[in-house]
Every structure is written in C-alpha cells, then in structure tokens.
C-alpha cells in the first residue's frame, strides 16, 4: 500500500511554497501593465492568499497553538489575516485602471512581506523543531487534501487568470506545481482502490 505521507511535502514546505508563489505574483504586477493583466494578477494574489489563510487557520495554526500558543507570531496571525481580507475586499471593489487599485496591491504586498518574514524566521522553524518530520508530513497530506477542495470550484478562474497574467515561464512553473498536486490526488485515489 502506498504511503502518501512519504510523498507529500511537509506542511512547512507547502507554506513556504505558497509564500514564494504569492511573492512571484506580486513581482509580476506593475502599474504600467495592461488593465487585464493587472486584474488577473490581483485576482491571482487574492485567491492564493485566501486559500493560504484558510489552510493555515484550519490546519497549521491549531497545531502550533497546542504546542506553543504564547508565541507572539501566532497570536497576531488572526488579526493579520483579517486585515488581509479587508484589503482584498477593497481591492476587488476597485478597477485595474484606478490609482487606488495599484495602491491596494502595494499595501497588500507590504503586509504579506511582513507576515511571511515572521512566519519563515520564527514560526516555521519552531514548528519543524517541535513537531518532527512525520507529523509535518501528515499535516502536509491534510493540507494537500484541503487545498484541492478549496481550489476545485475556482480552477477555471485560476487557470484563466494564470493565462492572462503570467509570463510564459512563470505560468509553466505554476501549472507544473498544480499538476504535481493533482498527481498526488490521483495517486491517493489509486492507493485507496
């Protein structure tokens, strides 16, 4: 029988990948881009952040709170996610030709950079130290399954935004990772059969 835990990246590696994906997308966004590209990139950023925040809130943060709920980074995670959702709502209410749209993308980027720095320098290393490789892999499997549930209803929109917003090499990288995630799902179905 196939052990998915050994195939799945650890939850901390998945979180780092999410951070990298969003940062790459932010770097694709320029104020001089065509409105259709700006809209597609902004929507890609918003969707990725919403999915990422949901995964952290449902799977990662509860486990971290159990092992060290007093960690300041974990205590400020919920307010940071709430602020992110507020900015996303405001961003979606603006059009890509409005100056406010560009300002909100930059505000969101600053907030995300701060959040990523906290997680990657404090929270993720601590989780790796305290949880151990097997538990991190188990959580990675949970995160992969939940991610697929969250992505499935948005797959068409995600693909369209990727095609519009990304350069060829970036789109290929993103689609390659998406293909890998789908392969994990396929393998899990085969293993269960």
Task: Describe every region a protein language model picked out.
Residues 1-193:
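Small-residue-biased structural context
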């Amino acid at each position: 029988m196939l052990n998915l835990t050994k195939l799945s990246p650890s939850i901390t590696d998945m979180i780092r990948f999410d951070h990298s994906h969003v940062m790459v997308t932010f770097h694709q966004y320029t104020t001089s881009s065509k409105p259709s590209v700006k809209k597609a990139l902004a929507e890609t950023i918003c969707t990725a952040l919403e999915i990422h925040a949901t995964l952290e809130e449902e799977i990662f943060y509860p486990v971290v709170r159990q092992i060290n709920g007093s960690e300041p980074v974990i205590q400020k995670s919920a307010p940071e996610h709430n602020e992110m959702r507020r900015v996303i709502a405001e961003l979606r209410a603006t059009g890509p030709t409005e100056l406010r749209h560009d300002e909100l993308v930059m505000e969101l980027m600053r907030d995300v950079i701060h959040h990523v720095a906290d997680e990657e320098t404090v929270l993720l290393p601590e989780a790796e130290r305290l949880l151990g490789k097997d538990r991190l892999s188990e959580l990675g499997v949970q995160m992969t399954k939940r991610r697929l549930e969250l992505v499935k209803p948005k797959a068409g929109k995600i693909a369209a935004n990727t095609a519009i917003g990304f350069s060829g090499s970036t789109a290929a990288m993103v689609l390659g990772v998406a293909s890998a995630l789908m392969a994990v799902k396929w393998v899990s179905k085969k293993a269960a059969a």
